[in-house]
Amino acid sequence: FSFLIFVGKEINIMRLEERYDKVLAWFRERMPVANTELQYNDPFQLLVAVLSAQCTDKRVNMVTPALFEQFPDAESMSKASVEEIFELIKSISYPNNKSKHLSAMAKKLMEDFNGIVPDDFELLQTLPGVGRKTANVMEAVAFKRPAMPVDTHVFRVADRIGLVTGAKTPLETEKQLVAHIPAEWLSTAHHWLILHGRYVCVARKPKCEECGIAEWCRYHQKKLS
């Protein structure tokens, strides 16, 4: 009996590894280069753009040019009032909280880091408004290190495809993805999952008929059964 359980686990592991192999190979062939859709010029501007998110990147990109023109770096933003920042980002979601975070973040950068965004995962999380996901974005995008930021798209798509099992939190999803995706592809895979979730595997009505990885997708297979 115990042998059968062991064999069953081995089969499940093989299926999971095969799914990863097929899905990653598909993305590598069709999207060898994948990047964020946020527009920025340096780590500070990327951090500002990420902290301005929780809405579409397109919406963020509509407000950041004027914001960066007026406050291109931590020093200039640290001298701005919360109200001045608010006026420039008021068309995005939660502008009250975001303007406060941006102001406090810029001041913290000036006080503790000479205006330079730290390239350390733990230090990044000492900045106001910066949690694990944002710190991972900075690691992956700004500093080109292996990291897997888990936003709503990554969380949903990884679960639907079947890349994760029983993950209830972004951290659980992150750990499972990191355990199976080669480090050299980790940051790129983050973009693959985001873009796939944004344009194909959308939240309410996933476009399975347009999906190139449907044949390996757990969600699609359940629909067919």
Q: Can you describe what each PLM-predicted range is?
A:
Residues 1-13:
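Short, Lys/Arg-enriched N-terminal segments with co-localized hydrophobic residues
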